[in-house]
Design a protein with these regions (language model features):
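Cleavable N-terminal export/targeting peptides
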Residues: 1-39, 253-259
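Residues on the lipid-exposed face of transmembrane beta-strands in outer-membrane beta-barrel proteins
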Residues: 47-51, 74-78, 143-149, 167-171, ...
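Membrane-spanning beta-strand positions in outer-membrane beta-barrel proteins
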Residues: 44, 85, 162-164, 199, ...
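Gram-negative (and chloroplast) outer-membrane scaffold detector with strong preference
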Residues: 31-32, 80-181, 252
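Extracellular loop and loop/strand-boundary signature of outer-membrane beta-barrel proteins
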Residues: 57-62, 127-134, 182-190, 228-236
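Residues that define the transmembrane beta-barrel architecture of outer-membrane proteins
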Residues: 41, 66-72, 135-141, 159-161, ...
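Short glycine/proline- and aromatic-enriched beta-strand/turn motifs that initiate or cap beta-hairpins
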Residues: 29-77, 174-176
Length: 259
């Protein structure tokens, strides 16, 4: 999994570098139309919902099964032209993560003091990793820049479709409670941790009407600071989210969009 994290981090860095190259062209193609406005300027708001997967000491792809998470939120932004838009968003979600195969095979235990042990501890409550899951609640608050790649080409600049790469930066809160898999009993209560989250999404959207836009997205967010799952950090250095979902946007009535 560490190799996967390094690979994904490298890809994110390459994507950000590519966007830094493309960004000046987005302003260059912002051709001024009627009354100084571009053909696709304006404010918009929307809702989004997705399925996040967490990768930390524990993982959504655990030894027992794949745990499906959920997340939902609101966003609002401004579209400057057919290429470039920026938005703010707020989202809440929950996930369950469980031990990976390697930790189960090594028979790791979690003590009630929050320390990893390689066997049960006499005189202290302890639990096998194989019997535990981490229930993570999270909030994400931040900003995103969208670069519509189709807008770079004259033939597709005014298409109903868009294909966007979207670097983002978030303030992320996580709170992880450790529970048993068998009966969902809470064995350790977590505290709230703050993280800086950064990454990028790939989005595909379609303008249904002059007001409504439907889209899908998939992206990665790497988290700084403490592990999101509340487990002791050992061997696994991963701490990132992979989320895919749908978006429904509404162009506000005082904006200027082409028919």
């Amino acid at each position: 999994m560490n190799d996967m994290a390094n690979y994904l981090t490298t890809k994110i860095r390459l994507l950000v570098a590519m966007l830094a190259f493309i960004l000046p062209f987005s302003f260059a193609k912002a051709e001024v139309k009627e009354d100084g406005k571009t053909i696709s300027q304006g404010w918009y708001v929307g809702i989004e919902g997705g399925m996040p997967f967490g990768f930390s000491t524990f993982s959504s792809f655990g030894h027992d099964k794949t745990h499906l998470g959920w997340a939902a939120g609101l966003y609002g932004g401004y579209r400057f032209n057919s290429i470039f838009s920026a938005e703010l968003s707020a989202k809440y979600g929950e996930m369950n993560l469980s031990a990976q195969d390697c930790c189960v095979e090594r028979n790791y235990w979690l003590g009630s003091d929050g320390v990893l042990y390689k066997a049960g501890v006499l005189g202290m409550d302890s639990w096998e990793y194989a019997n535990l899951k981490s229930h993570v609640r999270m909030g994400q608050y931040g900003a995103r820049v969208n670069i519509n790649l189709l807008g770079l080409f004259h033939q597709t600049a005014n298409s109903r479709w868009d294909l966007a790469v979207s670097p983002h930066i978030y303030a992320v809160t996580t709170k992880a409670d450790i529970r048993t898999i068998a009966d969902d009993a809470k064995v350790m209560k977590g505290s709230t941790n703050w993280h800086l989250g950064y990454g990028a999404d790939l989005q595909v959207g379609y303008q249904l009407t002059s007001c409504l836009k439907l889209g899908i997205y998939s992206g990665l967010t790497r988290l700084t600071g403490e592990h999101m799952d509340g487990m002791p950090e050992y061997q696994h250095k991963n701490n990132f989210l992979w989320e895919s979902g749908i978006r429904l946007g509404i162009n506000l009535p005082f904006t200027n969009h082409h028919p």
